[in-house]
């Protein structure tokens, strides 16, 4: 499968099955887009019409580009076949129905009102609710009972905002720690948080019990505060950044990462990555927004 996109003036072609990334000019970008569904003659005609008047785009140049594409295909670097497709249905069979990870939705609610939230402010288009300790405990028992001979088990504490169910989070981690040795298991917990409820107790707990912490920040203050707001419409940047910096500093090199979302409002999101790096954060991830195509935040060709 080939993905094509434009970023910061570059034409990028990603061949996902080989992992090859190509940075190409406009002509090659267009030819690659047409390559699988058009004959060489049709490509020459369409490209010649589009770039009429350009002295560097003649029929020979177009045909040379087509030959270059053929060479990349032959080398397994473009339009590569998915060699794993036939195995996809056998993964469950080969795993022996073993479960090794669990995402616990401990808080079906949130204290932020982010405009682009795919989870509808943590409610997932339902009613606000918090997971009970009993349900969480049964989920951890289920994971252990169905993990077979696996020792390391991953549990993600998610929401909504999981710190809104703080007491249950602490009790569930305590329960897991109390039984993991006798069950021959090792729990690795990850917490995802928007940072609003972080305090010294949370920092100490996370740095003791969490194998990883995911901290939500969209980068520059003006970008973050355009969407990541509370229910009064106030931005969150000034309240969460000091807490994130304190947590990361106290973490002493343990795993964490800043998790940002880029939208139609910040196609220059590399500047948000640089901003977070300037704040002292070294583990960074920016992900595209997940929303309906007609949402104002949606990423479009515009």
Model-derived segments and spans:
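Acidic, low-complexity/disordered tracts enriched in E/D and polar residues
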Residues: 1-35
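A C-terminal junction/extension of Radical SAM enzymes
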Residues: 61-62, 295-302
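A short small-residue
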Residues: 119-122, 221, 290-295
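Short acidic, hydrophobic short linear motifs in intrinsically disordered regions
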Residues: 38-54
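Radical SAM/AdoMet-radical enzyme domain recognition
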Residues: 136, 140-156, 165-291
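A short acidic, helix-capping loop that chelates divalent metal ions and anchors anionic groups
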Residues: 125-126, 223-228, 294-298
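Conserved alpha-helical substructure of the radical SAM core
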Residues: 57-72, 79-82, 86-204, 209
